[in-house]
Design a protein with these regions (language model features):
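N-terminal cap/lid segment of alpha/beta-hydrolase-fold proteins
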Residues: 20-49, 94, 98
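A fold-wide structural signal in alpha/beta-hydrolase
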Residues: 50, 76-83, 123
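Active-site loop/turn elements of alpha/beta-hydrolase fold enzymes
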Residues: 56, 80, 87-89
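Bacterial N-terminal signal peptides
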Residues: 7-16
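Short beta-strand element of the alpha/beta-hydrolase
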Residues: 48-56
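Catalytic nucleophile-loop/oxyanion-hole region of alpha/beta-hydrolase
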Residues: 63-70, 85-119
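Primarily recognizes the serine-hydrolase "nucleophile elbow" in alpha/beta-hydrolase
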Residues: 103-149
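Positively charged n-region of N-terminal signal peptides that target proteins for export
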Residues: 1-4
Length: 149
């Protein structure tokens, strides 16, 4: 009887997972050395908007799961493409993660037509150190890499 009750409680959660709104997932190399990647989660019904997500980790590691991938379903349900950036650690050179973020924005814009994204509706967000990176890109990036929001 307990198993039946547990199954009845778990079934809606399993169905919710099966009803995920992500249509396509792509992984793109974002740096010449291959250490930086961009994982793109495209929604079934695109709104034309995309967000580059920079997970945090104190510039010593990255919290890719709970500050990156776990947000894909939330954004995709709203028709927003989520692009989770695995940026390289600075190791004394602040330009390393900045260049990874610049490349990510440029990649999203360059692929906009193929991914059903408006190239003038690309934003950036981040958590902790990733939030610092996102704000630095928003205020210091050259025009081609500056996010729209």
């Amino acid at each position: 009887m307990k198993r039946l009750i547990l199954l009845a409680l778990a079934l809606p959660m399993l169905l919710a997972c099966a009803n995920a709104q992500t249509a396509h997932k792509l992984k793109i190399v974002n740096s010449a050395d291959g250490e930086s990647t961009l994982e793109v989660f495209l929604p079934e019904t695109p709104s034309g908007r995309a967000v580059v997500d920079c997970p945090g980790g104190g510039y010593s590691h990255l919290a890719m799961q709970h500050e990156g991938y776990d947000w894909a379903e939330y954004f995709n349900k709203q028709g927003i493409a989520l692009c989770v950036l695995k940026y390289r650690m600075p190791k004394g050179d602040r330009n390393i993660p900045l260049s990874d973020a610049y490349n990510a924005i440029k990649t999203v814009r360059d692929s906009a037509a193929q991914w059903h994204i408006n190239p003038h509706d690309v934003g950036i967000m981040g958590f902790s150190a990733g939030g610092h990176l996102a704000s630095s890109v928003s205020t210091h990036a050259p025009f081609y890499a500056r996010p729209d929001f």
